[in-house]
Amino acid sequence: MAEMKIADIRAMSPDQMDDAIVNLKKERFNLRFQRATGQLENTARLREARRDIARIKTIAAQQRAKTK
């Protein structure tokens, strides 16, 4: 999966954001194991997954603050 764009994340519903976070956490878990066993080819994907999670969480927090 490529880096997520801000506009794409803002278009997601809160449930879709939660699902995306769960999927990214699973992917990150698998990538960490691949790195530990020496099978990981694209090491930059670890950073992208971590940052995608942060992007989604940040936008979700902004949207929650806006609705209050």
Swiss-Prot record:
InterPro entries, A to Z: Ribosomal_protein_uL29, Ribosomal_uL29, Ribosomal_uL29_CS, Ribosomal_uL29_sf
The family note in this entry says: Belongs to the universal ribosomal protein uL29 family.
Gene Ontology CC: one annotated term: cytosolic large ribosomal subunit
Stored NCBIfam families: L29
Species assigned in the record: Bradyrhizobium sp. (strain BTAi1 / ATCC BAA-1182)
Q: List the disulfide bonds.
A: none
What keywords were assigned to this record?
Ribonucleoprotein, Ribosomal protein
Q: Name one GO biological process term.
A: translation
* PANTHER family from the UniProt entry: 60S RIBOSOMAL PROTEIN L35/50S RIBOSOMAL PROTEIN L29, LARGE RIBOSOMAL SUBUNIT PROTEIN UL29C
Protein name (record) = Large ribosomal subunit protein uL29
